[in-house]
Amino acid sequence: MKELFLEIGTEEIPAGFIPKAMADMEALLAKELENARISFDDIRTLGTPRRLALTVKGLPTVQPDAEITAMGPARNVAFDAEGKPTRAAEGFARGQGVDVASLTLVATEKGEYVAAVRKESGRPVPELLAEILPRLVANIPFRKSMRWGALDVRFARPIHWIVALFDGVVVPFTFGNIESGTISRGHRFMANQPFPVRDFAHYLEECERHFVIPDPERRQEIIRREIHRVAKAAGGHLLPDEGLLEEVSFLCEYPSAVHGTFSAEFLKVPREVLITSMRSHQRYFSIVDDAGKLMPGFITINNTLTEDPTVVVKGNERVLRARLSDARFFFEEDQKVKLETRVESLKNVVYQQKLGTSFEKMERFRALAEGLADLLNPAVKVKVSQAAFLCKADLVSGMVGEFPEVQGIMGREYALIEGEDAEVAAAIAEHYLPTQAGGELPASDIGAFVSMADKLDTICGCFGVGLIPTGSADPYALRRSALGIINIILDKGYRLSLEEQVDKALGLLAAKLTRPAVDVKADVLEFFRGRFVNLMADRHASDAVDAAVAAGCADLVDAAARIAALSEFRSHPDFEPLAVAFKRVGNIVKEGVDAPVDTALFQDAAEGLLNDAVQGVAVSVREKIATGAYLEALTEIAALRGPVDTFFDKVMVMAEDERVRTNRLALLTGIARMLGAIADFAKIAA
C-alpha cells in the first residue's frame, strides 16, 4: 500500500483559519477518495502559518474495477408495441457505450425502466490524484480568501509552492501558476531555503532541520512546557489559558518562550483589564503568585530562537507599557463620572434600530428582572432592580470603549469603588454570564435574574422584528442566550413558566414589534424548545427526551426531571415490553374518555383485574408525580404491565356495545393520563 503527501506552502495564514482548514482538508479529501473508489487507511493533517499539509496511508496503486448501472427511459418509451428498441433506447445505449441488445429492464416504484450495465476498468491512482488534488486545494473554504497577481484562483493567502508525492513520485498538477513538485521551504527567518522531500517521514525530518515543527499538537506541547518553565523561573505560576495556547501555536513554526515585566504600579488597574490587555491585544500569558495574585510579568512566544532575547523582551515590554498606560488612564478618568450618571448616556446609544436605545432595553429587562424576583425570591427585588439599572452603564465608559471584553467587569469595579452594595456590584458582572457554552453561570439570584431578563428581552426583541437566526447566521447570539437562560434555570432549579415570561417580555416590547405577538411567541417558545431538546439529547437518549418534552416543557426543571427519570427507568428489566404495552394504551385511547369506570359493565375478569391494579396505584402515583418523584411513579406504573397484557389478550376494547366500549376506553384513559403526565410513550423506541 502506498502513501500520499501534499503540502501547500503559503504566505502567513491567519491563525484562526488554520484549524478549520486542516479539518476541511481531511473531510474534502476523504469524500474525493470515496467518490473515486479509492480505499485508504487514514488521513493526517498538519498546519502552520506558512503551510497546510496532509498525508494519506494505505492507498492502492490502481482504482478497483467497477460495474456501473445507468438508468434510462421507461420501458414503454424504450420499446415499441412489438418489443423493438425505439430511437430513445438506441440513443441511450449509444450514449452509454453499450450495444442496445445488452440493455436490461429494472423494476422501480414508478414502473419498469431500461438500464445499461457497463464495466469500468480501474485507473491508476496517481492519475486520479492529479485530478483530485487541484480540486482539493481550490475547495478548501476560508472565511476570507484572496486572489493574487492576475491569477483566477483564490486561497487564504498567496501560494508559493506545492509538494505532491505518491509513493515518492510527483503527482503533477498546476494551481494558478504553481506547479507541484518535491521542493518545500524552511523557516522564513531561520532557514529560508528550499529542500527536497522524498516522503512524509523525510518531510518531518527535514522540517526539523529547517526549524519548522509542522505538527500543531507538538508545537502546543513545546509551548506548554516552555511557558510553565519560564513562569517557574520568574518565581510564579502560569495563569492557564488553553484558548490562547492553541492560538499562539498557530502563530509560529518554531516556538520559544521569553519572560518580560511591567511596572508594579499597573497592578492598581483591575486584574481582568491587565489580563485582557496582555491576552487579547498582545497574545501574552499572565503569571500569578502562590496566592493566585497577578504578578507584574508576562510570557510571550517568539517564532524564532534568539541567543540574546533582551531586544525582543524590551520591544514587547515597550508595547505593553503603552497599552497598560492607556488602561490606567481610562481607569482613572472613568472614576470621575458615577455609574448612575452614565446611565443617562445610554439614551444616546442605539441598541438596535428597531428596538430602540440601550436605555430603553434596560428599562424593559429591569421590569422583567423585578418580576422574576417577585416570583422566585422577593427578598432581593430591590437589589435586582438596582443591578439591572446599573449593569449597562459601563458601556459608555472609556475603559470598555478601549477594551470591550471587560464590559460588566468594569461596571462591577466602578460600583465597588463608588460604595455600591457588594451583591449588586457582583450581579453587574454576572449578568453577562454564561459567555459561552458550558461557561460559568451567575452565582447569585440577583445576577441570575438580571442575566435571564436581559437575554429574554434580546431574544423576544430580535424575533419580534424579524431578526431570527438561520442555519449559518446568528449575529445577536440568540442561541447562546437561550442556552444561557436554560442552563441558569436548570442550575438554580427555578420553577417558572417560560411561556408566562415570554408573554411579559412581549408585552414590554409591544410598541416595537413588527410581527404579530402571537406568531413571535410561538416562534420563541419553539426556539427554546429546540435548544432544550438539543441540550438534553447530549445527556440522555434522544427518544427519552422527545417523549418527556412531548408531555410538556413549559417548566424546564420539571421536564428535565422527567427526562432523567425516564432515562433511568430504561434499566428496568421489563422496559421494552412495558413501553410497547404503554404505547398500545396511548394509541387506543388517543384523546381519552372523560367518564367514570363502571364496574357493573365489566364482562371479563381481565377488566376487573386491570381496574383493581389501576386503583391500587393511582393515588400513590398522583402523589409522586405531584412531588416530582417521577422514577418512583414509573416504577409503580410498571406493576400494571401484567394486567394490561392480560387485558389486551382477552378483551376486545372496541366492543359493539357503545356503553361497554366507552367503559373500557375510560379504564385505559386512567392509565394513559398517569403516563401522559410524565411522557408520551409513543415517542419511545421499543
Curated annotation (Swiss-Prot):
Location (main, coarse): cytoplasm
One Pfam family matching this protein: tRNA_synt_2f
Family annotation (PROSITE patterns): AA_TRNA_LIGASE_II_GLYAB
E.C. code: 6.1.1.14
GO MF annotation list: ATP binding; glycine-tRNA ligase activity
Alphabetic keyword roster: Aminoacyl-tRNA synthetase, ATP-binding, Cytoplasm, Ligase, Nucleotide-binding, Protein biosynthesis
Catalytic activity, reaction form: tRNA(Gly) + glycine + ATP = glycyl-tRNA(Gly) + AMP + diphosphate
Cellular location(s): Cytoplasm
Top EC group: ligase
Gene Ontology BP annotations: glycyl-tRNA aminoacylation
One GO cellular component, as annotated: cytosol
Family the UniProt entry places it in: Belongs to the class-II aminoacyl-tRNA synthetase family.
Subunit structure: Tetramer of two alpha and two beta subunits.
Stated name of the protein: Glycine--tRNA ligase beta subunit
Gene from which the chain derives: glyS
